[in-house]
Amino acid sequence: MATVKELKATARPKAGKGAARAERRAGRVPAVIYGDNKPPVTISLDDKALRQSIFAGHFLTTLFNIDLDGQKYRVIPRDYALDPVKDFPLHVDFLRLGEGATIRVSVPLHVKGAELSPGVKRGGTVNIVNHTVELEAEVDHIPQFIEVDVSKLEINNSVHLNDVALPKGVKPVLREGMTLVTVVPPSGMGEEAKGGADAAAAAAGAAAPAAGAAAPAAGAAKAPAAAAAKAPAAGGDKKK
């Protein structure tokens, strides 16, 4: 079940960069609510409260009830911008959610059981191939994250999307067979296997010339013997 949090907002009558900068100087963050075939609503939010929500994690998969002068808007964040140097929020876009809405969300992947994995115990490493999963979900069933259990994975084993049980009302957007997590071997393991194969190939290659050398030697021994056997017979015919 999706988490729903409360945020208080104030109306922002003016738009534009100048008005947005004025809001930030006043300790507020400009934002907009759009969607559900209704006109956009420009608002501003308390900077401190918004920061807490963003940095608490799972911001883009959290539902919010935004209270604007007593009117409630049920929304989900779709995008936000942070200052590249100081990391404070600059702007947020909220999508208004209608009754029974279904939306696409990018949900983070959480891995559990790595310390129990036989492959990890043998020196392997858990490699997260996809850190997020694109899902289509009913708004009341948006998962905060997708959990993947790797406790039984051997080296070179993987977990695919169709191996994971998704919550009710949730289905994948991309192919179900996509790889989520794999256990990769330690760096030296592949080189050792290659070295063993190279040594076996070299031994087989050395055996082949030796066998070839033995064959001409046998042929050379037979040829003089045959010539010696024929020579006296030829000489005897001449004396007659």
Swiss-Prot record:
GO biological process, one term: translation
Sorted UniProt keywords: Ribonucleoprotein, Ribosomal protein, RNA-binding, rRNA-binding
Entry GO MF terms: 5S rRNA binding; structural constituent of ribosome
Database matches in Gene3D superfamilies: Ribosomal protein L25, beta domain, Ribosomal Protein L25, Chain P
Protein known as: Large ribosomal subunit protein bL25
Function in brief: This is one of the proteins that binds to the 5S RNA in the ribosome where it forms part of the central protuberance.
Pfam annotation, one family: Ribosomal_TL5_C
Keyword ATP-binding recorded: no
HAMAP family for the chain: Ribosomal_bL25_CTC
